[in-house]
């Protein structure tokens, strides 16, 4: 991981690097002195949120509203999409009694982007069911600005924010030693504060502040064979049935999108080999993606002596488990989730060693981390193994894509003033 990080940061090797290490253009963490009224726009799926975030001496007050994007808007023209967003921004501002006030806005845009400045990023490709025309390759901040002009919406878009960077910013407002942000949800990614002098790909100015947050895009790690010694036959089977075959291999061993499928494949093999369920594979158990990652969380959260939750889930999948089957299935879930936590920490330890800090807080967000009963404790134990002597606190970061984006706008306002 450390070698991959260095390749991503070096301008000579960045083009072919697997872990891209994109500079976010966010140069400074909050110091708690940020004050004022800010807006945030969080667009990452078929619902988007508009938020008003009021910062008052370390205290944060938020109001927000969720808007649904119709499928014809997701798949129509870019102008239609951004005009609709501008209309919603206008409506929200009026509801907040700020119709004519020009306020700074932080824009979280959770699609693959090439960032060219703090408030400039080109869409690389649409994902998650979006296909609005005339947007790929264009600056999405510029498109939103133009829509705001067309719709007469007074807003100053000061930053485009990656959700991982937002996770770090959200936490750093209250923790001055937060230097790493981590997402452990459907996908996984990390970011951290790097010295500008270590960023060979930096194209901005080299004045103060002399740091920049790096968006690692670390889920891509492993496609050069770096993880081959750790990948099992089940990991390879999962990779075979995904649309991005051979890519995001680290993510496929860690994140919530894939853990349930890994467990299902193990169950099918053990059943076929005659070790589970009397050797009978049910049609549901034989169906890809039918064993959901939330089942791991439910099974491992069950503290009863009879593994009742496990029995309920397996019965719903059409198999009849024995008492020993239940214990085996639980053990498999634990093995898969523990491996995921340990692999995530292996990546973190490379970042922590590179930074050389003796004490730090890691801001973490994502459904896997939030909902799984032992993910956090497994991570903490592994951190003590891999980076002994460093004092590390894992802190749940609340609402990185909303509050975090507003804080990026607030820090930009503080620095420019």
Description of each model-found segment:
Residues 1-103, 149, 174, 231-417:
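ATP-binding/phosphotransfer module of carbohydrate and carboxylate kinases, centering on a glycine-rich
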Residues 177-184, 202-204, 227, 231, ...:
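A polyampholytic, Gly/Pro-enriched intrinsically disordered region
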Residues 187, 197, 221, 264, ...:
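Short, glycine-/Ser/Thr-/acidic-enriched flexible segments
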Residues 108, 161, 193, 365-367, ...:
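Generic beta-strand/beta-sheet core signal
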Residues 52, 190-194, 215:
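Conserved blade-register residue in beta-propeller folds
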Residues 33, 41-49, 110, 164-165, ...:
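A short acidic Gly-Thr/Ser loop motif
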Residues 66-86, 90, 113-180, 198-220, ...:
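Glycine-rich phosphate-binding loop and adjoining helix at the ATP-binding site
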Residues 36-42, 102-106, 157-159, 179-183, ...:
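Short glycine-aspartate micro-motif
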